[in-house]
Structures are given as C-alpha cells and as structure tokens.
C-alpha cells in the first residue's frame, strides 16, 4: 500500500473516530444530556434533519412528547416543550424578563439593511413593529372592512357559478386571501378571483416559501449545506429571487399612487417618522412578509376548518344553525355582527388547535448566562421552542385532544381541566402576530358567507385530506367539495 493511501486511510479513520467521540459526548456528557429524549436525536443532528426534509418532523415530535414527556431533547442543542409555562418563560410574558431572541438559523438571516418583522433583532423589531402597528389597529380594520368585503363577495359570486359542481376549496380560499392581501399591501388585487386561477406571482410566492424552508435547513448545517442546496431545484431558488424583485416593483407602483386608500401602506406612511421609521428596503421586505403571513395562513386555517366541519356533521349542523338564524339577509354580515357568533369563534379556535397553520417549532436562543424554563435551568445558547401541533394534541393539555370539539372553548365541564393557555397559534409576548384581529375578522367573515350561501359535501378523494407533510407550513393537497345552493335561499343579482 502506498504512503499516500495510508495517509488518506489514517485521516478517514481519524475523522470517523472524532465523529464517534462527538456523538458519545453529545449523548452522555453534553450539558443537555440529562433531558429526556431518544439518545440518537441527542447524539447527532442527522435524525432531526432527516425528518425535516421528509416533512414528518411535527408528527415525530408529537410522538416523542407522548413517550418522553413535556420537555424533550430533539437534537444535541435543542429542547422542545409542550407545557404552557414554557411560553411565558421563553417569550418573557408576565415574567419581567425580556423575550429570548429568535434563532437566526431557524428564522433565516436578516437581509443586509432590510430586516423583516419576522427575523429582526430586538431593537429593529420594536421599531418596525411600532410603525406597522398602525395598519392593524381597530380603526384601521374598520376602514379596511369595505375593501375586505368586496373580495369576499366576489368569491361568493364566483362560487355560485359552480353550483352543483365539485371545487377545490384550498384554491378558492387562496384566491380570496391573496387577492385581499395584494390589495391591502400593494393597492391592487392579483386577479385570482377574476380569472379563477392563480396569478403567476402567487404561484411563485407559494413555491418560494417552500424553497425558503429548505434553504434555512441547509444553512443550519454548514457541513451539509452544499449537498442540501443541490437538492433544491434551481427554478425554485430562482422563483424566490423573482418574488423579491416583483415585490419591489409592486411596492414602487403603489407608492407612486397619490390617492388615499385604507391599505397597509397608507397607515404606515402616515405614521412614518424620519428618525425611527422604515427605510424603503424595509418596506419592501415587510410587504413581502405580510403577503405570506396574512394570506397563506388564513387560507390554510379556512381549508382545515372546512375539512373538519365536513368530517364532523354534528358540529357543522350546529354552526349552520347559528349562522342561518342569526342573519335575516346576507347584507347583515359585517365586522360587528360576526363578532356575535359565539359558536363560530369556538369552531375557529378548535380549528387553530387541531390544525394550526404553522404547526412546528419557532426556535428562540437562551441568553448566554442561561435561563430557567419550566422550573429547570437551561444552559445558554440552547435552542428552545414550543411545538404547536404537539402541544395542542397532547393529553397533558387537552381532554380528547385528537377530536374536533368546539365546546371545549364554551365552558363544558368535561373540558374544565384543559390547559387552554397553551394554545398560542399567533404567538405571544412582544413578537406576537400583529394581524391577529384582522385574521379572526377575515376567517369569520369568509366562513360565514360560505355557510350562509352553500351546503357543502366532502368528496371521497378528500376523505384523508389532513394526512399532510409539513415544510414550515402544511403541504396541502386539493380539498374537493361539492357545492350545493342553500335550499330556499333567494339570490339577488
């Protein structure tokens, strides 16, 4: 054997030995080694990466929590929680502590000179949130109602053209919410409802979201980054770049319009402070963020809610009765009246629990000095999070956790021990979602209009629709539903 081959074999053996030592250290001697969880996950990052690429990590985490308890170690430097106290300890809510910073490896690195509200550091986040909050105030929502209503009514008009036909409700909810948020963010609709198909920009956006997920997974593990990036189709990466370029063009077009209209930009610019306001690059990246956060998540929740209603006829019948007895005509459905639909709100809360639009973990970093989470000290620089889906489906938190029962939010005695404070689909603390009130209004308004006008029937091919993979968000298939005009309903032209 030549000397060169001997050296190469020696180096290979050394590398393998080093890796084995690292795995042994991580599994049995690491500061987190005392936490429960499978030793394989604690030893290496590979099992977690494998399940994230497969899209089944949420179900894996749920099963691990059921086996090991309310806090588990899911990678060498990561802890996952399902106890409601973890929300308070991690976000600083009610504890007098600052919230923990978001992990840049999980949320993506902020673009140079253009942080988004999603991944900005604390100081930038406070400044951006303060400026953007005016677009989501109660007064702004009242002014935006007519714009929102116009898109919902167009959706209903389009669906009426498909009476007695089978439609994909995922697409129709997406058409509606993307058109709505295009109008709110850029001053013009994407035209999805008008054309009854996805605008190329919207298709590009959906593709770029998935690309972003895989890019973040690749960046987490530098040693595998080149290999992982090679699995991301070049077209998908290009679509992500094209999305940012089109966002810039659309925002520039809106800013050139002099008219006053109740969209996000008008409220933001009206309260823009020269010293602490948002720069043009920040406006561009955050307009893009709003489209993603507002449209896709709302459409996802509505799709899931529709599916679970159709799989639970008792709940559907009760909700139909509330909607159809509360209003004498469709014209009465507005921002004020939908707030009185108590069972509707319980249904939406239950849908958010059973099928949260963002079901996974959103990692924070424990400060360098360490911190106490759920009464136990956690070393600094540890990744920590609450896994939404696992927490919401845990028998530790909810009675009959896998059943769709809205009455758990209406005070029924058998659910009195439910730990409802674990349900935080919009987040909590200083980084909670700004658009919570807008989202609830949109969801109530859209679902109320749909149920007022139509009887729905789930098609056999969508019976197991909820069996989905997760790539940050649900990878949703079509939801095939047959539309039937509501019996006895007179439709005015």
UniProtKB/Swiss-Prot annotation:
It comes from the Eukaryota. Heme binds at residue 433. CDD domains: CYP60B-like. Its cofactor is heme. Asperterpenoids A and B, but not the final product asperterpenoid C, exhibit potent inhibitory activity against Mycobacterium tuberculosis protein tyrosine phosphatase B with IC(50) values of 3 to 6 uM. It is found in: Membrane. The chain crosses the membrane at residues 5-25. One of its GO terms (cellular component) is membrane. It catalyses: asperterpenoid A + reduced [NADPH--hemoprotein reductase] + O2 = asperterpenoid C + oxidized [NADPH--hemoprotein reductase] + H2O + H(+). InterPro entries: Cyt_P450, Cyt_P450_CS, Cyt_P450_E_grp-I, Cyt_P450_sf, Cytochrome_P450_monoxygenase. Its EC number is 1.-.-.-. One of its GO terms (molecular function) is oxidoreductase activity, acting on paired donors, with incorporation or reduction of molecular oxygen. Cytochrome P450 monooxygenase; part of the gene cluster that mediates the biosynthesis of the asperterpenoids, sesterterpenes that exhibit anti-tuberculosis activity. The first step of the pathway is performed by the sesterterpene synthase astC that possesses both prenyl transferase and terpene cyclase activity, converting isopentenyl diphosphate and dimethylallyl diphosphate into geranylfarnesyl diphosphate (GFPP) and further converting GFPP into preasperterpenoid A, respectively. PANTHER family: CYTOCHROME P450, CYTOCHROME P450 MONOOXYGENASE ASQL-RELATED. Belongs to the cytochrome P450 family. This is Cytochrome P450 monooxygenase astA. It comes from Talaromyces wortmannii (Penicillium wortmannii). The lineage of its organism: Eukaryota, Fungi, Dikarya, Ascomycota, Pezizomycotina.
């Amino acid at each position: 054997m030549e000397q060169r081959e001997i050296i190469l074999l020696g180096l290979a053996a050394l590398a393998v030995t080093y890796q084995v030592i690292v795995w042994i250290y991580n599994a049995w001697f690491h500061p987190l080694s005392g936490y429960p969880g499978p030793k394989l996950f604690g030893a290496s990052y590979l099992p977690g990466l494998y399940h994230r690429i497969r899209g089944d990590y949420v179900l894996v985490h749920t099963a691990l929590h059921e086996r090991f308890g309310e806090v588990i170690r899911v990678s060498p430097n990561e802890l996952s929680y399902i106890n409601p106290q973890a929300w308070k300890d991690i976000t600083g809510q009610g504890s007098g502590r600052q919230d923990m910073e978001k992990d840049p490896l999980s949320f993506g690195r902020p673009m140079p000179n253009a942080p988004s509200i999603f991944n900005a550091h604390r100081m930038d986040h406070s400044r951006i949130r303060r400026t953007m909050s005016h677009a989501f105030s109660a007064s702004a929502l009242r002014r935006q109602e007519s714009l929102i209503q116009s898109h919902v009514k167009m959706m209903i008009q389009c669906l009426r053209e498909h009476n007695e036909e089978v439609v994909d409700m995922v697409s129709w909810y997406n058409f509606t919410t993307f058109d709505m948020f295009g109008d709110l963010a850029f001053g013009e609709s994407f035209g999805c409802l008008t054309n009854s198909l996805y605008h190329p920009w919207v298709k590009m956006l959906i593709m770029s979201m998935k690309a972003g997920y895989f890019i973040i997974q690749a960046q987490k593990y530098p040693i595998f980054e080149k290999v992982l990036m090679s699995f991301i189709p070049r077209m998908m990466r290009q679509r992500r770049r094209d999305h940012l370029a089109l966002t810039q063009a659309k925002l520039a077009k809106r800013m050139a319009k002099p008219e006053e209209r109740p969209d996000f930009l008008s409220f933001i610019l009206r309260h823009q402070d020269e010293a602490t306001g948002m720069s043009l690059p920040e406006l561009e990246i955050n307009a893009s963020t709003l489209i993603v956060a507002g449209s896709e998540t709302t459409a996802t929740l509505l799709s899931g809610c529709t599916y679970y209603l159709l799989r639970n006829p008792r709940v559907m019948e009760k909700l139909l009765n509330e909607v159809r007895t509360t209003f004498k005509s469709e014209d009465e459905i507005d921002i004020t009246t939908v707030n009185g639909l108590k069972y509707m709100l319980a249904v939406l809360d239950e849908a958010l629990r059973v099928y949260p639009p963002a079901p996974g973990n959103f990692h924070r970093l424990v400060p360098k000095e360490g911190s106490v989470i759920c009464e136990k000290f956690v070393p600094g620089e540890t990744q920590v999070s609450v896994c939404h889906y696992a927490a919401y489906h845990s028998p530790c938190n909810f009675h009959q956790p896998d059943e769709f029962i809205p009455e758990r939010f209406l005070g029924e005695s058998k659910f009195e021990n439910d730990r409802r404070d674990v349900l935080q689909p919009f987040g909590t603390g200083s980084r909670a979602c700004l658009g919570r009130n807008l989202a609830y209004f949109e969801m109530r308004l859209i679902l109320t209009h749909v149920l007022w006008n139509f009887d729905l029937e789930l098609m056999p091919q969508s019976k197991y629709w909820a069996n989905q993979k997760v790539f940050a968000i649900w990878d949703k298939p079509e939801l095939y539903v047959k539309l039937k005009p509501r019996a006895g309903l007179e439709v005015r032209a």
